[in-house]
């Protein structure tokens, strides 16, 4: 029972309070209050933290996360996901009174709980609702009559009311749509996207009753620049999110299939797409690896639910299978390029640029770059993964791989050496060129004329193959000439580099 009581009246048919004074309804059968919100956002990752910060600009907001280290990091003003501008985070803490905690006692006074936890799949690609179940139990331990719980996690239609609500009822002893209420507003965060930030994203909203739907819609509208779309039901809102990502997965699978066809025919796929996109209604997308915690995961939620209803979703299933095989395909195409140039694949030295699931983002969840690595590791163990965005400790912990956050050779790359490479097929890396690279790096030759041991270009001409797997901005300015061995090849997954310096691209 909350101590800061709402000004709402007791009859079960009453309207939501219109007063902004001290809101907290606390009687069984209580109607939801429409004002004076005190919010708790449960789950402070890529989605939850930016959302909590945004709400703190208008409402008293507390962030809750079971990870004590994450809470401490945030309260120190740091966000390791790099999703939230730390200036905004510090402002929220210092000026808005934004608080993060792992203590249940500190969130009991809230009257709106927003759940933003991951919804992954297991090793068999079946929906894993463990984080969602845990968060629902947390809500059940603190929720009071009149409160509202809003879910943002991506799920198949029915999860909120069929899986989550019964847990809250069991934990709290309260009755759904009599004592407490629910809403669903699916997250639309695009990790690493600094243009479409949370306040600029139009949100779908919904509620368990028309009255609650209005409260939830007004809540989000109060902080969003581009407003909301109020769905007619929670199930409709759930379905809308799951098809957003499933549609994108299917479209990318089509592009990947085209890439395989055109590569076999010796036609550049991106040239084809550029030409086709000259028609006004052609939907231009690009082939590539599909990883991360959304597009490569969410379709499995709908696939499983469809099968429960006796429907076999053939297109989505085929798209998932095709996209999941693209890492191995890239590795095989790289090997093919090496063979064509007479480069021995066995024990060759290969550099993979990027391990995160997308560009300019530290998120490595479900990255398909691993499939490139594992396929190539059947032929050579001399594989280096370089990613200036990824956390080496996180990668080691999650995947058992050692990556490097820096390459010694890169110190030789300076402005003016962007993508400097001999024409495709050239097979020499003269010592004078290496020395020039050292001079550009500010390291002169010793009195003997030999390169000093500390010269960053001393290891130039190192890799037999370079695979640009992730289009981080930093990779645009690398000195590829200094990195590539004589007759080495470059494979560009993203079509990111100048065509004249690459041997093949997806």
Residues covered by each model-derived region:
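Structural/interface elements that position substrates and couple domains in central-metabolism enzymes
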Residues: 2-11, 17, 25, 32-425, ...
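Proteins enriched for Cys/Gly/acidic motifs involved in redox and nucleic-acid/cofactor modification
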Residues: 441-443
